[in-house]
């Protein structure tokens, strides 16, 4: 059994590729079924966010394993293998465990130490449990990663400063608009990222917010908290002209805001500028919008420069966190190896007990037939001894014939010989 982590993220692939490799919530069950149907896969978890798509797998080692999994991923998304291969990373066993722990702790995020990723990893794990069989080692790896993430956040200052994609989007808005108290902000979506954006905006005295979402109930709960108006996605075209700032983060597989929609809004605004921050993957705003005069479009990748300015104080904490991850990953792999030994011990004990039971049954039968008790006990002891030492004796003889002193010493140690 081998543990694997493979995928792409914001460091290895541009948004144009990442959006083609995402797994939407609507198709996740189907994707998991397809993945677990692969003969080498024993268990799997799919993590798909704005900044990464990753597969965490428990697999049986086989020839061309990497090729088979890349082929599955490309076939599922109708991708050219060469396009994906150049951006794909592949981690195995200890490296896979360390990678997941780093991801869950926010150490591999676009925003170092951001807390949202832990919730996303937990959701990915929970989704994989719904009607899908998972390998126990994979489950244990995820549970351990959750506790490591908690330890990192508790024992270091990795989360001391409020830095996130949501925070960066608000920082960008403050850089472009002198005061946010007089602007109207349209938020598209009502997920966790938009919730954070809305709270940041409220803290910076934004008075007018509009939340557009597919389901009104979820949006209304957020609107009640921050004092916003709620509209449906179909109302965006009519209301876009009211917005000075648009920040969008949905799970839609297709763009929600098109070039024509923005052109009409700009015309109604008499070309007053609009800031559009698209932090969704796949993108919510057609890239062509950025070519329009007075429409200033930023994608999630464009936020990197803003985010970089807020990371200095987290670097020392990240070093401490990496030490924790290294230690915990090593302990997990020791546990995993011990599980393999435990299975061997169980098999050895079971085999010994079978030999004991077989010979004891024969001895009792001989006693019941009136045989000499002393002779029967001596015979039992002799046969039991020979049966138990037969396999180790053969191994010792073979090691001696091979001149394998290291194996001989291991066998001597295993048998408790001085």
UniProtKB/Swiss-Prot annotation:
GO BP annotations, alphabetical order: protoporphyrinogen IX biosynthetic process from glutamate
UniProt cross-references to Pfam families, sorted A to Z: GlutR_dimer (PF00745), GlutR_N (PF05201), Shikimate_DH (PF01488)
Gene3D superfamilies: Glutamyl-tRNA reductase, N-terminal domain, NAD(P)-binding Rossmann-like Domain
Record bears the keyword Transmembrane: no
Listed GO MF terms: glutamyl-tRNA reductase activity; NADP binding
Keyword field: NADP, Oxidoreductase, Porphyrin biosynthesis
Annotated catalysed reactions: (S)-4-amino-5-oxopentanoate + tRNA(Glu) + NADP(+) = L-glutamyl-tRNA(Glu) + NADPH + H(+)
Site (Important for activity): 99
Enzyme class: oxidoreductase
InterPro entries named among the record's database cross-references: 4pyrrol_synth_GluRdtase (IPR000343), 4pyrrol_synth_GluRdtase_dimer (IPR015896), 4pyrrol_synth_GluRdtase_N (IPR015895), GluRdtase_CS (IPR018214), GluRdtase_dimer_dom_sf (IPR036453), GluRdtase_N_sf (IPR036343), NAD(P)-bd_dom_sf (IPR036291), Shikm_DH/Glu-tRNA_Rdtase (IPR006151)
Keyword Oxidoreductase annotated: yes
Catalytic-site annotation from UniProt: 50 (nucleophile)
Main function: Catalyzes the NADPH-dependent reduction of glutamyl-tRNA(Glu) to glutamate 1-semialdehyde (GSA).
Oligomeric form and interacting partners: Homodimer.
Family from the record: Belongs to the glutamyl-tRNA reductase family.
Name of the protein described by the UniProt record: Glutamyl-tRNA reductase
Species name: Salmonella choleraesuis (strain SC-B67)
High-level lineage: Bacteria, Pseudomonadati, Pseudomonadota, Gammaproteobacteria, Enterobacterales
Gene giving rise to this polypeptide: hemA
């Amino acid at each position: 059994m081998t543990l694997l982590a493979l995928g792409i993220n914001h460091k290895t692939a541009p948004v144009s590729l990442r959006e083609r490799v995402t797994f939407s919530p609507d198709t996740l069950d189907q994707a998991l079924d397809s993945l677990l149907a692969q003969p080498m896969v024993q268990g799997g978890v799919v993590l798909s966010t704005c900044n990464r798509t990753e597969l965490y797998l428990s697999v049986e080692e086989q020839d061309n394993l990497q090729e088979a999994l890349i082929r599955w991923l490309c076939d599922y998304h109708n991708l050219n293998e060469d396009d994906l291969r150049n951006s794909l990373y592949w981690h195995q066993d200890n490296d896979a465990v360390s990678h997941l722990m780093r991801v869950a702790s926010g150490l591999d995020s676009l925003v170092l130490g951001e807390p949202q990723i832990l919730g996303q990893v937990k959701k990915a794990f929970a989704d994989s449990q719904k009607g899908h069989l998972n390998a126990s080692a994979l489950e244990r790896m995820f549970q351990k990663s959750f506790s490591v993430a908690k330890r990192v956040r508790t024992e270091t200052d990795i989360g001391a400063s409020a830095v996130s994609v949501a925070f960066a989007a608000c920082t960008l808005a403050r850089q472009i608009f002198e005061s946010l108290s007089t602007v109207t902000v349209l938020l598209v979506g009502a997920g966790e990222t938009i919730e954070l954006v809305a709270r940041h905006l409220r803290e910076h005295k934004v008075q007018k917010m509009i939340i557009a979402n597919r389901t009104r109930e979820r949006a209304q709960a957020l609107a009640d908290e921050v004092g916003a108006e709620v509209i449906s996605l179909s109302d965006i075209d009519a209301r876009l002209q009211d917005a000075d700032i648009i920040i969008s983060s949905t799970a839609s597989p297709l763009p929600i805001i098109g070039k024509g929609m923005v052109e009409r809004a700009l015309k109604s605004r008499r070309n007053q500028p609009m800031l559009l921050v698209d932090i969704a993957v796949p993108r919510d705003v057609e890239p062509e919008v950025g070519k329009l005069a007075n429409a200033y479009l930023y994608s999630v990748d464009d936020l990197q420069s803003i985010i970089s300015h807020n990371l200095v104080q987290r670097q020392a904490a990240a070093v401490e966190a990496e030490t924790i991850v290294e230690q915990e990953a090593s302990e997990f792999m020791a546990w995993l190896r011990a599980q393999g030994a435990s299975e061997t011990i169980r098999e050895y004990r079971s085999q010994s007990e079978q030999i004991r039971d077989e010979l004891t049954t024969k001895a009792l039968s001989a006693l019941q037939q009136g045989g000499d008790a002393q002779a029967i006990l001596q015979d039992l002891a002799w046969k039991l001894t020979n049966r138990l030492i037969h396999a180790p004796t053969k191994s010792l003889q073979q090691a001696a014939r091979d001149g394998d002193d290291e194996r001989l010493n291991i066998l001597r140690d295993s048998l408790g010989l001085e």
